[in-house]
Amino acid sequence: MWMRRNQIVRKLTLGVVTTVLGMSLSFSALSATPVETHGQLSIENGRLVDEQGKRVQLRGVSSHGLQWFGDYVNKDSMKWLRDDWGINVFRVAMYTAADGYISNPSLANKVKEAVAAAQSLGVYIIIDWHILSDNDPNIYKAQAKTFFAEMAGLYGSSPNVIYEIANEPNGGVTWNGQIRPYALEVTDTIRSKDPDNLIIVGTGTWSQDIHDAADNQLPDPNTLYALHFYAGTHGQFLRDRIDYAQSRGAAIFVSEWGTSDASGNGGPFLPESQTWIDFLNNRGVSWVNWSLTDKSEASAALAPGASKSGGWTEQNLSTSGKFVREQIRAGANLGGGDTPTTPTTPTEPTNPGNGTTGDVVLQYRNVDNNPSDDAIRMAVNIKNTGSTPIKLSDLQVRYYFHDDGKPGANLFVDWANVGPNNIVTSTGTPAASTDKANRYVLVT
């Protein structure tokens, strides 16, 4: 990033507006990774916050089972997901049964490879103890405690690591009967070596019964409760459970969801998926999509034969993958999704100024002079001083800067008096670059 902010090239290309627009935009510098930006995560009043106490929403992708599609879990693919898709979290799904860790403990090496890649790339990573056909997490509780003792010993000082200790308890297994007692023991094992990294705990009925967990929460303050859904099968009743759990102060993490039905294959159901994503973003609930694979099923993100190392074009993505990529890229421009908001419809001015028709005044203010935080934060005020209303949708603002050879970017709209959901941001490359400006942020 061009760090001397008073020397950054600032070039604004304006359309015209109908009313006063006040915006505060914060841009993580291109050298700042998600972990550098947010640091140690924790739970505060049932919501996920970063080390500055600011609410944060994680959005990313899960691997498929490592025993089947582990080749897609590598630094190159994860880097592409970070830089092109905009993920800030990756989930590595290590099955316990079905030729998973219990019969093939060497799969732990792939988990370690994924964690090392995530550390290097500065993204958060979920280590997923993926129980499924084994139903009850207590079946392999001893192995879980051994595994998570090793993971916590290795990564207890790494703020990007998140432990998911029971993917989808099912088969009549209940929160109070089996899951909570198991979670207490495994949490104690983790906390003996790692005092503060996040822990995600699955809930009953394939991680749908978060209401039961909300009514009898675990004592650990940095625990989240998993809800899983598949858009073609699960609808409003599960969204209602999220609202209920949040009203009880429980922190919720959608650590797995799919655009398909619950089989993983029917669909994809994109309108239903959009309803879910809008809801999760509105409630500030973090989410991870299933899954990074080229398997011939609706929930797969990649088309059959896609490269194992990223670089995917539109043709390499499935219908689901294209949709999820769009959602993650759009979500990277949200202000964290922490406060439910209703988009505001811009209105025509009732008392326009006396200036010449179409006159536009733009005021820019730098609100961050700290050279050590790798961020650009700005406030922009735009006013139509003419006598004729002009549409806000005609407005474009470009902010030019140099990326210093680091292509990743995190963009956030902190506030806008027309509602942050009505502001769209993206990055682009100018036709003619200079040694001081080779990128721009477009605000519309």
Swiss-Prot record:
Catalytic site: 168, 256
Residues where substrate binds: 64, 68-69, 95, 130, 230, 262-263, 290, 295-297
Compartments where located: Secreted
EC class: hydrolase
Comp. bias (Low complexity): 339-358
GO MF terms, alphabetically ordered: cellulase activity; cellulose binding
GO cellular component entries: extracellular region
Location of the CBM3 domain: 356-444
Cleaved signal peptide residues: 1-31
EC number: 3.2.1.4
Keywords from the UniProt entry: Carbohydrate metabolism, Cellulose degradation, Glycosidase, Hydrolase, Polysaccharide degradation, Secreted, Signal
Pfam families per the UniProt record, alphabetical: CBM_3, Cellulase
Sequence intervals crossing the membrane: none
Gene Ontology biological process: cellulose catabolic process
Region (Disordered): 332-358
Catalytic reaction list: Endohydrolysis of (1->4)-beta-D-glucosidic linkages in cellulose, lichenin and cereal beta-D-glucans
InterPro entries attached to this UniProt entry: CBM2/CBM3_carb-bd_dom_sf, CBM3, CBM3_sf, Glyco_hydro_5, Glyco_hydro_5_CS, Glycoside_hydrolase_SF
Primary localisation category: secreted
The organism's place on the tree of life at top rank: Bacteria
Entry's family note: Belongs to the glycosyl hydrolase 5 (cellulase A) family.
Listed name of the protein: Endoglucanase N
Organism name: Pectobacterium atrosepticum
